[in-house]
UniProtKB/Swiss-Prot annotation:
Gene label: cmpk1
Region listing for LID, in residue ranges: 133-143
Organism encoding this protein: Xenopus laevis
Enzyme Commission numbers on file: 2.7.4.14, 2.7.4.6
Name of the protein: UMP-CMP kinase
Residues reported in the UniProt entry to bind CMP: N100
Cofactor(s) it depends on: Mg(2+)
Molecular function, one GO term: CMP kinase activity
Binding-site positions, ATP: G13, A14, G15, K16, G17, T18, R134, K179
Known partners and oligomeric status: Monomer.
Gene Ontology biological process terms from the UniProt entry: 'de novo' pyrimidine nucleobase biosynthetic process; CDP biosynthetic process; UDP biosynthetic process
Length: 193
C-alpha cells in the first residue's frame, strides 16, 4: 500500500506542530516533521549529513531536497514496515520551495499519494510572538527575532508560491491559524471529518 500524504504548511509559529499532534490523536495519522527529522539527523554522531544540515539550519537556509526526501522516505518506510495499517502521514514543513516540490515529484511520483495541503494561514507578527514565546522553553536555536525574520522572508518568498501552486490544483485546505488552539482545531476537524 502506498503512503497517503497530507502536506502541512504555514509560517514559523503558525501552529503546525500543535495541530498535527491533535490530528494524530484523533485521526490516526503519523506526523513527520521535516524540520525535526533534519534536527535529529544533525545530532547523530555518525550521520553522513550532520554537519551539512547544521550549516544550512544555522544560516536559516533550506536544506538540499535530496537529504530531506531521503529522511522522509526512510521514516515512512520504517513506520509502514512496523505497522502496515499506518499508511497515513502528515508531513509538516515540506515542500518549502520549488526545488522541494520538484524533488518530491521526481522521487516520490507513484510511490506516495498527496491528498491535499493543509495550510495554516497566520499573520507574521502573531507567528513571531508565538515563536519568541516558544523559544523561551524550546531551546531551539532558531527561535530568536533575527532568525525568525529571515525564516519568515524565506517562507514568503519560497513556500507561499508552492501553496499558490497547489491552490491552482484545487488541493489546498486553508485554516485561519491566528485563533486559539481549540478554535483552529475545530476548523481542522471540519476538513478531516
Amino acid at each position: 500500500m502506498k503512503p497517503l500524504v497530507v502536506f502541512v504548511l504555514g509560517g514559523p509559529g503558525a501552529g503546525k506542530g500543535t495541530q498535527c499532534e491533535r490530528i494524530v490523536q484523533k485521526y490516526g495519522y503519523t506526523h513527520l516533521s521535516a524540520g525535526d527529522l533534519l534536527r535529529d539527523e544533525r545530532k547523530k554522531p555518525d550521520s553522513q549529513y550532520g554537519e551539512l544540515i547544521e550549516s544550512y539550519i544555522r544560516d536559516g537556509k533550506i536544506v538540499p531536497v535530496e537529504i530531506t526526501i531521503s529522511l522522509l522516505q526512510r521514516a515512512m518506510e520504517r513506520t509502514m514496515a512496523f505497522d502496515a495499517n499506518k499508511h497515513k502521514f502528515l508531513i509538516d514543513g515540506f515542500p518549502r520551495n520549488e526545488d522541494n516540490l520538484q524533488g518530491w515529484e521526481r522521487t516520490m511520483n507513484g510511490k506516495a499519494d498527496v491528498s491535499f495541503v493543509l495550510f495554516f494561514d497566520c499573520d507574521n507578527e502573531t507567528c513571531i510572538e508565538r515563536c519568541l514565546e516558544r523559544g523561551k522553553s524550546s531551546g531551539r536555536s532558531d527561535d530568536n527575532r533575527e532568525s525568525l525574520e529571515k525564516r519568515i522572508q524565506t517562507y514568503l518568498q519560497s513556500t507561499r508560491p508552492i501553496i499558490d501552486l497547489y491552490e491552482k490544483r484545487g488541493k489546498v485546505r486553508k485554516v485561519d491559524a491566528s485563533k486559539s488552539v481549540d478554535e483552529v482545531f475545530t476548523k481542522v476537524q471540519n476538513i478531516f471529518d
